[in-house]
Amino acid sequence: MSPQWLAYSKDSPPESITKPMQKLVEVLADKQALIEKSLALVLEKITTSLDQQDYVTIALSGGSTPKPLYEALSSQPLDWSKIHVFWGDERYVSPDHPDSNQRMARLAWLDRIPIPAANIHPMPTDDPDPQLAAQKYDDHLRQWFGVNSPDFPVFDLILLGMGDDGHTASLFPQTAALTVSDRCITVGEKDGNPRLTFTVPLINQARCVIFIAAGESKRPALHEIFSAHGDSFSYPSRLIHPSAGELYWLLDAAAGSSFV
């Protein structure tokens, strides 16, 4: 199967889109092709950013799908001193916990490259109160980017996954986190367990957002997300539409064949 591109323009936006935007969807033959395309696109965005500025900022997703991408990135000959890594969400567990997104990225990628420790910006999960931890990371982002409220930091690249229920980061269906509009970081919840997560407005300030999704189980949610009449509160990934940036959806054939 050759890659297929679909363009969703301002003439056929989801209900949540209020500004003209083009969304690019590419369906790859299998998971290996998906990771290869993801790697090529991430490297392109890093290179382009470094051609225009002194450093690049990347926010990572968790889950199993991006792990091969992170492993592939670990062998790339990049100037890691110019790359700053953040996380788009994190389970509220210790950094060495098997479920930690930070741990997964470190083992697959960051511990295997000569990146300065100061360039790694994990979400804090050591405070007894997740709300205080969310505020700490919010403060860190604003201080590091030099941005005061009500403005939001602008990431060069945000990587996102999508769950079978249409959630992304830790923005779950029918939850209060979806409506937070004045903060960079909020507390999401899954099965009663707190998580830290980027907010919708922070994600939508990014210069580039790349969704990576695989598997037949994603099809029903993708149908609703790409529908002109889907419910964004039930399928939170619909809320992601960078106001002045690029949005890519990279899918394997199992997930995206019905969109070809």
Mark where each language-model region is:
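Ligand-binding beta-strand-loop-alpha-helix segment within the catalytic cores
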Residues: S81-D156
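Glycine-rich beta-strand-to-loop/alpha-helix junction loops that act as flexible
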Residues: L60-T65, L160-D164, A214
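N-terminal glycine-/serine-/threonine-rich phosphate-binding loop
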Residues: W5, P13, I17-I58, Q131
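ATP/nucleoside-binding phosphotransfer catalytic cores, i.e., glycine-rich phosphate-binding loops
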Residues: R207-V260
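A glycine- and small-aliphatic-rich helix-loop capping segment at beta-alpha/alpha-beta transitions
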Residues: A72-W80, R103, P173-S181, A228
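A short secondary-structure junction signal
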Residues: L132-A134, A169-Q174, A221-I225
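Class I SAM-dependent methyltransferase SAM-binding "motif I" and its flanking Rossmann-like core
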Residues: L157-P201
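Glycine-rich N-terminal segment of FAD-binding domains in flavoprotein oxidoreductases
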Residues: L50-S75
